A protein has these predicted regions:
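Proteins that catalyze or organize thiol-disulfide redox chemistry
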Residues: 1-2, 28, 111-116
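A short beta-strand-turn-helix
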Residues: 1-9
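Hydrophobic beta-strand anchors of alpha/beta hydrolase catalytic cores
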Residues: 9-10, 38, 83
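Catalytic metal- and UDP-sugar-binding loop of GT-A-like glycosyltransferases, i.e.
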Residues: 12, 41, 86
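Conserved redox-active cysteine motifs that mediate thiol-disulfide chemistry
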Residues: 12-29
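Solvent-exposed loop/turn segments at secondary-structure junctions
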Residues: 14-18, 44-48, 70-71, 99-102
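Conserved segment of the thioredoxin-like fold in thiol-based oxidoreductases
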Residues: 22, 30-67, 80
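Thiol/disulfide oxidoreductase modules built on the thioredoxin-like
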Residues: 53-60, 66-116
Length: 116
């Protein structure tokens, strides 16, 4: 999860989760920043065509990855949406529960200080 000196915002989502669907436009806007990569994780573990169908129907434009919980040494979320904020050096600095806005996500990044 340490790529290109960018902050990583890892968002766990599911198509049946209304707050997840509502925050996707905010995540798309955040992903446009030069210093941030938004990475989606489908909570239901969908792959292939099933995942592509959900991604297209929700208008997700950011990359989707496999669940990184084990690699990060954190438990898999039990509540959706859950968003992890990771510094460019790979340090997990925040686990956010519930829907986020671009402002709330940018505030966490700002408060976490300059990249380590």
């Amino acid at each position: 999860m340490t790529q290109s000196g960018r902050w990583k915002v890892v968002n766990f989502w599911a198509i049946w989760c209304k707050p997840c669907r509502e925050e996707i436009p905010e995540l798309r806007r955040l992903d446009e920043r030069e210093d941030v990569s938004v990475l989606g994780v489908n909570f239901d573990g969908k792959q292939g065509n099933d995942l592509a169908t959900d991604v297209a129907s929700l208008g997700i434009t950011f990359q989707n990855i496999e669940d990184p919980s084990q690699a990060l040494g954190v438990p898999r979320p039990t509540v959706l949406p859950t968003t992890l904020i990771i510094t460019p050096s790979g340090e997990l600095v925040a686990t956010l529960i519930g829907p986020q806005t671009i402002e709330s996500l940018e505030a966490v990044i700002r408060q976490s200080g300059p990249p380590r």
